[in-house]
C-alpha cells in the first residue's frame, strides 16, 4: 500500500517508562518507510505524571511538549494517534477514554487483565472509526516474519508440534520490592500475562488460532517481597508458567515462561517441527533463523541452514538505514516497524493485524490457561 497524498499526523505517547520510550523511538523513525512518503509525523506530547522523566524522554526523542495527565491531550483535536504504555490496571480506562475522544490508539500487551476487560475495549473500539491495536512487537522482526512465511508456504510440510519460551531474570532477586507486577489484582497475572502473551502471539502468528489449552501449571517461586512500608507482602501471581496447547489446525505446542530464569535477562525462542522439516528462532540472535528441509541433500549433508534476512524480508528495508543483507536488525527496528504499521493503518482506514480483536483472542487463550491451571483439566478457548 503506497500513500500518495501529503498529510500531517500528530502523535503522543502516554507513559514515559521503558516501553513508552520504545514507542517514542518507533515514532521518531517511522518516516523511513517508503509507503509513508508524504506523511509528516509530528512528535507532539509525552504524557507521564513524573514530569522530570517526561521532559527527559521528550527531549531525547524530539517531542515538542509534555503533560502530566492524559486529560491534557483528550480534547486536543490536532493529536490523532496515541500510544499507551502503562501498567495493566491503568491501561484499560486510558485506552477507553482515548477511543471515546476519537483518537487512534496502540496499547501495550496484554490488552487488559482478562478476556472480559479485553472484550470491553473491543466493544468501545467497535463504536468508533479509530484504529485500535496492540503492540506485539516480536512479530515485526524480519527474521520472525520470514520464518512465519516459510511455515505458511509449506516449507516444512504439515506442522506437527512447536515449542516456545520466554525467560527473564528481572524478578529473581527476592529483595526486589513489591510492585504491581507481583499483584494479581493489579496485573491480572504474572509471567503468563507479562511474557507468555508474547509467545502465544508469536505461535498464533505462525500456526494460526489456538483451539484448546490442554494443561497449564503456574508456580510462584518467591512468595513474599518487601514493601515500602517496611513489611513483606504476598506475591499473588505466577513467576513461572508451563502451558500445553493444541492449535485449531491440529499442531501441539508447549510454552515455558518465567521471570526467575537465572542468567537470562531476556531470552525468547520459537521452534516449529513439521512433516518435512523445522524452523527455529532465538531472539538473542535476532537477525537470523534456522530452516531444515529433509528433502534437501542426502543423510549427512541435509543439515539445517542459517537464513540471514535481507531487503526481500518484510520490515527490513523500511527500518534499516543501511538496508543490505547481513546488516543486523534488532528490537529497536521492531518498534519502528510497529509504528509504521500503525500509521499505515490510520492513513488507509484499515485495522492492523494486531487489532484489539486479535489481542482479545490472546486474552481468551490466557483465560483458558488460567482456568486449566485452576481446574486441572483441558479448556477449550472461548470464541468471541
Question: How should these model regions be labeled?
Answer:
Residues 137, 225-234, 242, 246-247, ...:
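C-terminal glycine/acidic-rich active-site capping loop/insertion
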Residues 81, 87-139, 154:
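Beta-strand-loop-alpha-helix segment that lines the small-molecule cofactor/substrate pocket
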Residues 1-61:
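N-terminal Rossmann-like dinucleotide-binding module
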Residues 64-70:
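Conserved SAM-binding strand-loop segment of SAM-dependent methyltransferases
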Residues 41-45, 80-82, 189-190:
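Short active-site oxyanion
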Residues 107, 132-134, 163, 255, ...:
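Hydrophobic residues in well-ordered beta-strands that form the structural core
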Residues 19, 138-235, 376:
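Predominantly a Rossmann-like dinucleotide-binding segment in NAD(P)-dependent oxidoreductases
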Residues 1-5, 35, 81, 296-297, ...:
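C-terminal helix-rich "cap/oligomerization" subdomain common to oxidoreductases
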Amino acid at each position: 500500500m503506497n500513500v500518495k497524498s501529503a498529510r500531517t499526523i500528530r502523535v503522543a505517547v502516554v507513559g514515559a517508562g521503558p516501553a513508552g520510550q520504545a514507542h517514542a523511538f518507533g515514532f521518531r523513525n517511522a518516516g523511513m518507510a517508503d509507503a509513508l512518503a508524504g506523511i509528516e509525523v509530528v512528535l507532539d506530547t509525552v504524557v507521564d505524571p513524573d514530569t522530570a522523566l517526561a521532559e527527559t524522554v521528550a527531549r531525547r526523542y524530539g517531542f515538542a511538549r509534555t503533560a502530566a495527565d492524559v486529560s491534557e491531550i483528550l480534547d486536543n483535536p490536532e493529536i490523532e494517534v496515541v500510544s499507551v504504555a502503562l501498567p495493566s490496571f491503568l491501561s484499560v480506562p486510558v485506552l477507553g477514554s482515548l477511543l471515546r475522544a476519537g483518537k487512534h490508539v496502540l496499547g501495550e500487551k496484554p490488552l487488559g487483565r482478562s478476556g472480559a476487560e479485553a472484550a470491553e475495549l473491543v466493544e468501545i473500539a467497535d463504536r468508533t472509526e479509530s484504529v485500535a491495536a496492540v503492540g506485539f512487537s516480536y512479530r515485526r522482526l524480519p527474521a520472525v516474519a520470514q520464518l512465519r512465511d516459510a511455515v505458511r508456504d509449506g516449507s516444512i510440510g504439515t506442522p506437527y508440534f512447536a515449542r516456545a519460551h520466554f525467560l527473564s531474570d528481572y524478578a529473581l532477586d527476592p529483595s526486589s520490592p513489591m510492585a504491581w507486577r507481583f499483584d494479581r489484582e493489579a496485573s491480572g497475572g504474572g509471567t503468563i500475562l507479562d511474557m507468555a502473551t508474547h509467545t502465544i502471539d508469536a505461535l498464533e502468528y505462525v500456526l494460526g488460532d489456538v483451539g484448546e489449552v490442554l494443561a497449564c501449571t503456574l508456580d510462584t517461586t518467591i512468595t513474599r517481597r518487601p514493601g515500602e512500608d517496611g513489611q513483606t507482602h504476598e506475591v499473588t501471581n505466577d513467576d513461572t508458567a508451563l502451558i500445553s496447547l493444541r492449535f485449531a489446525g491440529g499442531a501441539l505446542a508447549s510454552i515455558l515462561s518465567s521471570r526467575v530464569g537465572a542468567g537470562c535477562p531476556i531470552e525468547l525462542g520459537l521452534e516449529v517441527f513439521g512433516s518435512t522439516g523445522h524452523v527455529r528462532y532465538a531472539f538473542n540472535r535476532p537477525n537470523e533463523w534456522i530452516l531444515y528441509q529433509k528433502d534437501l541433500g542426502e543423510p549427512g549433508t541435509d543439515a539445517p541452514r542459517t537464513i540471514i534476512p535481507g531487503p526481500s524480508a518484510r520490515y527490513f528495508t523500511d527500518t534499516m538505514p543501511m538496508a543490505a543483507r547481513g546488516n543486523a536488525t534488532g528490537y529497536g527496528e521492531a518498534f519502528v516497524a510497529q509504528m509504521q504499521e500503525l500509521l499505515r493503518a490510520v492513513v488507509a482506514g484499515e485495522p492492523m493485524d494486531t487489532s484489539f480483536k486479535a489481542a482479545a483472542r490472546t486474552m481468551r487463550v490466557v483465560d483458558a490457561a488460567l482456568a486449566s491451571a485452576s481446574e486441572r483439566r483441558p479448556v477449550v478457548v472461548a470464541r468471541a
